[in-house]
């Protein structure tokens, strides 16, 4: 497993370098980044994060450290800048475990920020049983990494957006949203410094928080004949749902969309405002959205494995999130 893990990581880093070296001299549009999102790469990302070497990615474990290193190495390979005091942002979980968020900045031309996040932790290995967490939430991290790479590719081609994109892989979600609250504390206390501008990122500088949490499953369908669906939870007034509707007109996307959690006001409120990583941002008035394909019967089970995900549909969801961001930046 070690050899396969290292080979797959090497291949992903090599593909990132190759993408950065593409020829110029053509009209730049967001569509130029579509080829970065491939089913093969997404599958490799999920397989790496669900490998036995990552051991289920429970906070404070060697498997979590390996997952952090994997994410950090890819952030670095994409050219995402690290804060002066480091890419790994340490904190303690509710159970006292050492945990770390992993961050990377893609500089924009202006002074505002958009946070794009996905939690990488899961429940680990219990009583000798590995809980891989493919959908929850290796799929979200794979989406995060792919979106980061897509925007980096556009920047290499000469396209820069006004807000700086702050990509964050969050730890400790399964323990009281620890990583999300730690990220907010660092922002509120001025401890997260923009490595390019050289000044702290403050809450008032943030335009939006986008959270990606479980986007690989197809079992919790909106309509039984449409496995290709996506749920976006947001406040109606600030979520920019129109941006997702426009993104969905692309033939490469064309998903079955919903803006609530299966028609339930109560479940929509719980998942949007209480139990997901956008909570501390919402609590402080930052417009936030959550992308998900919903909870399935595999959640928190050993059967949540990489082969159970639909990577063609995951790719389309990644494109939807990417084009949503393009519209709101």
Q: Which residues does each PLM region occupy?
A:
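N-terminal capping segment at the start of a domain
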Residues: 23-66, 78, 82, 293, ...
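A non-catalytic alpha/beta surface segment that caps or lines the substrate-entry region
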Residues: 56-106
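Acidic/His- and Gly-rich active-site-bordering loop/insert found
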Residues: 49, 75, 92-127
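Bacterial N-terminal signal peptides
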Residues: 7-16
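His/Asp/Glu-rich mid-to-C-terminal helical/loop segments that flank catalytic regions of hydrolases
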Residues: 292-329
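Metal-dependent peptidase/peptidase-like ectodomains
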Residues: 111, 170-276, 288
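Second-shell loop/turn segments in exported
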Residues: 28-36, 52-62, 90-93, 101, ...
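Alpha-helical metal-binding/catalytic segments enriched in His/Glu/Asp
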Residues: 104, 116-117, 121-177, 321
């Amino acid at each position: 497993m070690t050899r396969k893990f290292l080979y797959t990581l090497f291949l992903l880093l090599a593909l990132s370098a190759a993408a950065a070296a593409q020829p110029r001299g053509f009209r730049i549009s967001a569509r130029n980044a579509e080829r970065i999102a491939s089913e093969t790469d997404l599958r490799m990302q999920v397989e790496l994060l669900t490998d036995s070497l990552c051991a289920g990615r429970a906070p404070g474990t060697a498997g979590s450290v390996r997952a952090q290193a994997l994410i950090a190495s890819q952030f670095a390979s994409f050219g995402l800048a690290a804060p002066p005091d480091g890419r790994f942002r340490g904190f303690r979980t509710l159970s006292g475990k050492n945990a770390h968020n992993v961050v990377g900045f893609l500089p924009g031309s202006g002074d505002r920020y958009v946070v794009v996040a996905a939690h990488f932790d899961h429940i680990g290995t219990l009583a000798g049983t590995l809980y891989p967490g493919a959908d929850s939430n290796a799929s979200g991290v794979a989406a995060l990494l792919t979106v980061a790479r897509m925007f980096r590719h556009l920047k290499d081609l000469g396209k820069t957006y006004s807000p700086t994109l702050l990509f964050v892989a969050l730890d400790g979600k399964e323990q009281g949203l620890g990583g999300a609250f730690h990220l907010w504390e660092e922002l509120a206390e001025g401890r997260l410094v923009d490595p390019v501008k050289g000044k702290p990122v403050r809450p008032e500088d943030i335009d939006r928080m986008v959270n990606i949490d479980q986007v690989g499953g197809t079992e919790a369908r909106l309509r039984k004949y449409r496995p290709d669906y996506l749920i976006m939870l947001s406040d109606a007034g600030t979520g920019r749902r129109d941006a997702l509707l426009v993104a969905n007109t692309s033939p490469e996307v064309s998903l079955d969309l919903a803006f609530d959690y299966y028609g339930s006001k109560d479940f929509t409120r719980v998942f949007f405002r209480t139990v997901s990583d956008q909570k501390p941002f919402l609590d402080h008035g930052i417009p936030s959205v959550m992308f998900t394909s919903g909870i399935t019967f595999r959640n928190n089970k050993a059967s949540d494995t990489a082969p159970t995900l639909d990577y063609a549909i995951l790719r389309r969801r990644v494109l939807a999130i990417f084009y949503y961001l393009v519209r709101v930046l």
